[in-house]
Amino acid sequence: ISRWRGYHGSGLISGSLTGLAVFHNKFDLPLDRILHTVTPHYLRRPDKDMKEEQFTEYCVDSLKKMISDEGAETIAAFIGEPILGTGGIIPPPKGYWEAIQKVLEDNDIMFIADEVVTGFGRLGTMFGSEHYSLRPDIITIAKGLTSAYAPLSGSIFSNKVWKVLEQGTDELGPIGHGWTY
């Protein structure tokens, strides 16, 4: 599950996760197995009479319904930027991340924090996840890693994810993870 207006790249899977029509039009994206939930952009809320806390509840309820409709067991992960990069560097509404993280934990859904924009001190903490007290299973990193002087990216895994990767490596051999620029 990703979010509309979120940006995660322009390849087949990352473009599908990106919630922007310009990355989908004429490319048969997003892939069917990729879901998008509502954008946590308070100024673009569907009902202008909603207070910020009500909008947070609306976002959370939308995610809960999606998970219920699809079945939590069919959902591998939720990906989101701590602060929505596309559309103007938009912080989430009050209480959003705390509530979203609880929904993910309650449904045993992995949480991926896309820290390409918010990582490496841009919010006053090393990662945007720290700023919002998030506990992601995976963190994606890039631009700030080299101050954008060189094309370098990476992933940081929680111990829970690392143990699964380590076990898989023992059984299946090394896991190839890389990209050619």
Where are these regions (language model features)?
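Conserved N-terminal phosphate-binding loop of PLP-dependent enzymes in the Aspartate aminotransferase
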Residues: 1-181
